[in-house]
Amino acid sequence: QPIEQLDMFRAEPNTYVFRPADGRETAAAYLSALRLAAPSVIALSRQNLPQLDGSGKSAMKGGYVIGHEYAGKKLDAILIASGSEVDTALEAKKLLEAEGKNVRVVSMPCMELFFEQDEAYRETVLPKAVRSRVAVEALGGMSMYKLVGLDGEIVSMEGFGASAPGDVLFKHFGFTAANVAAKVESVIAANKC
């Protein structure tokens, strides 16, 4: 199982790596790749993914808020995901909201494009003041540390995969809404100190 490949591609200079979460993000990835004067990698899922509310043109900025927090209330944490894990992050957000947490979900289909946006835009998506961040990616997660910082955590593959139906493997490796929500709770608690 090639869990390290996207980290490897992300480490290559002048290469754009896209991991879209649904059909609209896939279209945005293709349009972006056609406009770039650099190599692009578009990593698609074999799973049937739901069409997500709020996805679309904003994906062309590389990262955007797909699950908004409650306005007027302190933001407790930010969940960052790409590909098939964006839906899992949105489900984890629902669980956390039921516990009274105010959480934002950011879809990050292309980190390279996101970091090319101006500072003002990046701050609207990932405000520096919010240190409680959890990134979710069913791959090796080394490149996600750029997004979560020293105070965040990553739910990622820590070893090679296995052979079984996708839903069985996601549960086995902890890529469930319940596990992601528990990780967010842990990060929030750790950052209160």
Q: Where do the protein language model's features map onto the residues?
A:
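Thiamine diphosphate
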Residues: 1-2, 25-26, 34-193
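Mobile "lid/hinge" segments at catalytic clefts and subdomain interfaces of large enzymes
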Residues: 13-16, 140
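Short active-site oxyanion
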Residues: 15-17, 77-78
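TRNA-recognition modules of translation machinery and tRNA-sensing kinases, especially anticodon-binding
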Residues: 21
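Hydrophobic, small-residue-rich alpha-helical packing segments that form membrane-like cores
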Residues: 8-11
